[in-house]
Amino acid sequence: MHEQLNSRVETCYLQAETFFKRTFKRPVVSFQLRGQKAGVAHLHENLLRFNPQLYQENAEDFLRQTVPHEVAHLVAHQLFGGGIQPHGEEWQLIMRGVYELPPNRCHTYAVQRRSVIRYIYRCPCPDSDFPFTSQRHSMVRKGRRYLCRRCREPLMFSGETRTE
């Protein structure tokens, strides 16, 4: 799976070197990215991070658009220095001129949100469900108390959880 992406990174660098008639230092490529971002270019570390889940689910477009997008950031940084805008003229020049791609800033991949467990707390008031995050539930277990704003009684864990 990663070989294709690494190969595409190399191809993008070869295209940039042919276009600009100079060499570029190759980055470290990592697949340690989660969440909504498809890729991130760390300019000062010369590092590219890619989201393996989004790559797996959108491989064709990822290789065609996302990889050149991130490589263009590193190439722009090596050519023009740190004083440029992330998606500014220099980056757009590379996207259009070198890779012949539209300089799109964001991907349109469907991103699955992770499910979240809520811990249900209650007070004596009718219809008083208070869904707590795991972090807040942990604070209660360590001794923190939360009060109902209406009756001023402490909220008590009901033993119920809900997945959202």
Swiss-Prot record:
<dbReference type="InterPro" id="IPR023483">
    <property type="entry name" value="Uncharacterised_SprT"/>
</dbReference>
<keyword id="KW-0862">Zinc</keyword>
<feature type="active site">
    <location>
        <position position="70"/>
    </location>
</feature>
<feature type="binding site">
    <location>
        <position position="69"/>
    </location>
    <ligand>
        <name>Zn(2+)</name>
    </ligand>
</feature>
<dbReference type="GO" id="GO:0006950">
    <property type="term" value="P:response to stress"/>
</dbReference>
<dbReference type="GO" id="GO:0008270">
    <property type="term" value="F:zinc ion binding"/>
</dbReference>
<dbReference type="GO" id="GO:0005737">
    <property type="term" value="C:cytoplasm"/>
</dbReference>
<protein>
    <recommendedName>
        <fullName>Protein SprT</fullName>
    </recommendedName>
</protein>
<dbReference type="InterPro" id="IPR006640">
    <property type="entry name" value="SprT-like_domain"/>
</dbReference>
<keyword id="KW-0963">Cytoplasm</keyword>
<dbReference type="Pfam" id="PF10263">
    <property type="entry name" value="SprT-like"/>
</dbReference>
<feature type="binding site">
    <location>
        <position position="73"/>
    </location>
    <ligand>
        <name>Zn(2+)</name>
    </ligand>
</feature>
<feature type="domain" description="SprT-like">
    <location>
        <begin position="17"/>
        <end position="155"/>
    </location>
</feature>
<keyword id="KW-0479">Metal-binding</keyword>
<comment type="similarity">
    <text>Belongs to the SprT family.</text>
</comment>
